[in-house]
């Protein structure tokens, strides 16, 4: 999965995070480096909580941008138990201290997403459900790619990365355009036949209207799952896929 991440994008994340944390000066790091006389030191990355390791490329990008090197002992996707030695980071003291917090913030958050994704996928599979657990666009602003990467490492799907790779008509879109059919006609005129269109539905009637109007995907939003899903699948027919959204 690491090959999915373009190197220029990783470098941009690293630069932004480092600039956010140390926009001008790192006085404490500078003082520590003076005491150390600029010599090379070694830091050890430890896993202190059980979970899925994820975010290695982002961690490494931050370290490299700060002038450090990383030697990994475990890879993204592995389940780690505490206390596990994950990696060794080498560099000057001030470089290690500069990279430490942004690199750890990214790694811990992405690993948390991956861990929850794996647990949710495991629970869904245990019920015999054949579908795929996916994450939505409800991501942290500016952190979507890392969080989507965490979902993939954890074994979940990403649903969509933004508004351009899948057209999704939510209730406000449908309301603004006067109805499900009108909304579908409107987006089809712009998207053509190359992009799939998903319609968010809050009732059985809306779901059937969306399927009849040509929606590729019908999303049931916060509906009672058991009987509603079965009934919708039976009535909807084979031409549209079904997704389920829940808080």
Residue locations for each model-derived region?
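Short secondary-structure boundary segments
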Residues: 222
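Conserved phosphotransfer cores of two-component systems
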Residues: 239
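Acidic/glycine-rich phosphate/pyrophosphate-binding loops and surrounding catalytic core
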Residues: 1-209, 213, 217, 230, ...
């Amino acid at each position: 999965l690491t090959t999915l991440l373009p190197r220029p994008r990783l470098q941009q994340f690293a630069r932004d995070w480092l600039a956010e944390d140390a926009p001008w000066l790192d006085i404490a790091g500078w003082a520590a480096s003076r005491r150390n006389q600029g010599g090379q030191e070694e830091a050890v990355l430890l896993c202190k909580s059980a979970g899925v390791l994820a975010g290695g490329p982002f961690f490494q990008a931050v370290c490299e941008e700060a002038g450090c090197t990383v030697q990994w002992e475990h890879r993204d996707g592995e389940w780690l138990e505490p206390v596990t030695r994950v990696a060794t980071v080498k560099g000057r003291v001030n470089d290690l201290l500069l990279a430490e917090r942004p690199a750890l913030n990214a790694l811990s958050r992405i690993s948390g997403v991956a861990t929850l994704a794996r647990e949710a996928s495991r629970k869904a599979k245990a019920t015999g459900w054949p579908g795929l657990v996916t994450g939505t666009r409800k991501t942290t602003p500016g952190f979507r790619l890392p969080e989507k990467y965490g979902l993939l490492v954890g074994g979940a799907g990403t649903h969509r990365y933004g508004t351009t790779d899948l057209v999704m008509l939510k209730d406000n879109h449908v309301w603004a355009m006067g109805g499900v059919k009108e909304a579908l006609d409107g987006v089809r005129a712009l998207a053509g036949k190359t992009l799939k269109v998903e319609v968010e539905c809050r009732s059985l009637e809306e779901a059937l209207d969306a399927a009849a109007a040509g929606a590729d995907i019908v999303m049931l939003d916060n509906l009672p799952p058991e009987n509603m899903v079965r009934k919708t699948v039976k009535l909807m027919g084979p031409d549209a896929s079904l997704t389920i959204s829940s808080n």
